């Protein structure tokens, strides 16, 4: 290999890594009362996360609700978080973290009611009245969540939650119009519930990717490489000859199989065989 070819190979490798990580998605896990960012629940998400997802566990100051919410917001902005998952008390905090896709599992919907019931456990003290007051002071915000933001929330409730039961499922439906799903789980999130969330995340990503396959003329022409998730070939944009007129623009047809399943790399998506085959399985 010549020196020039060697340098080119190195540059392409670096660009490939940049391309890969640009397509990464990040999930932030917010634990419950006296939980841990390295606990079993977070480890389950790391075990079952979809491809190209990174799971980040964070700790927060649980003694002060307002400070905890600020710490979560700072983490979202610093890490570029795409999805937040919160369980129990972390579910309450996650509900109030607006502007991002989020899942809540067995959320402690009313901390002012549930926290006083907790007793000292394994060296951890019971919640103090001062701590409880900081959460009670934020509960009014639940009913003030904007309608558009509520659509970003998916709630799941364990069918065997020994602490909260199912009462907050009905309350959230009445207050927020969010009817939570029922999953096989006790209060601590089960592996089945984690698997369900990860499957939903994978499916949502594929739906997002699918949007790049129609009315995509501008994006295709800005790309260097295109891929088709029907025949799973990759090719240059100038090979595309046929377009379909859609309502808001033109849609590219694959030059090999003539299917409207073409995505350009200007989308930021990884057009490797793994991705194209995964899309093929989802949509064909």
Label the model's feature ranges.
Residues 101-204:
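The alpha/beta-hydrolase serine catalytic core
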Residues 223-228, 251:
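Residues immediately within or flanking Cys/His clusters that coordinate Zn2+
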Residues 228-231, 254-257:
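Short cysteine-rich clusters marking metal-coordination/redox-active sites
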Residues 241-251, 269-270:
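Short linker/helix segments within small regulatory modules
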């Amino acid at each position: 290999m010549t020196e020039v070819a060697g340098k080119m190979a190195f540059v392409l490798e670096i660009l490939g890594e940049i391309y890969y990580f640009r397509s990464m998605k990040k999930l932030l896990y917010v634990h419950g009362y006296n939980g841990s960012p390295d606990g079993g629940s977070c480890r389950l998400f790391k075990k079952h996360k979809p491809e190209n997802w990174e799971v980040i566990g964070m700790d927060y100051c649980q003694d002060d609700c307002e400070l905890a919410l600020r710490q979560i917001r700072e983490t979202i902005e610093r890490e570029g978080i795409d999805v937040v998952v919160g369980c129990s008390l972390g579910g309450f905090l996650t509900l109030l973290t607006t502007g991002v896709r989020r899942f809540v599992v067995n959320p402690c919907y009313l901390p002012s009611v549930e926290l006083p019931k907790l007793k000292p456990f394994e060296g951890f003290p019971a919640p103090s009245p001062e701590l409880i007051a900081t959460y009670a002071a934020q509960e009014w915000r639940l009913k003030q969540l904007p309608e558009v933001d509520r659509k970003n929330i998916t709630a799941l409730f364990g069918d065997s939650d020994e602490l909260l039961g199912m009462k907050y499922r009905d309350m959230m439906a009445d207050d927020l119009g969010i009817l939570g799903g029922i999953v096989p789980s006790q209060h601590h999130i089960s592996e089945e519930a984690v698997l369900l969330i990860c499957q939903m995340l994978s499916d949502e990503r594929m739906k997002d990717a699918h949007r790049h396959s129609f009315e995509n003329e501008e994006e295709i022409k800005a790309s260097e490489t295109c891929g088709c998730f029907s025949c799973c070939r990759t090719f240059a944009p100038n090979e595309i000859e046929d377009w379909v007129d859609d309502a808001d623009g033109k849609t590219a047809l694959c030059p090999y199989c003539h299917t409207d399943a073409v995505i350009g790399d200007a989308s930021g998506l990884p057009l490797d065989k793994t991705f194209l085959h995964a899309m093929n399985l989802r949509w064909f």
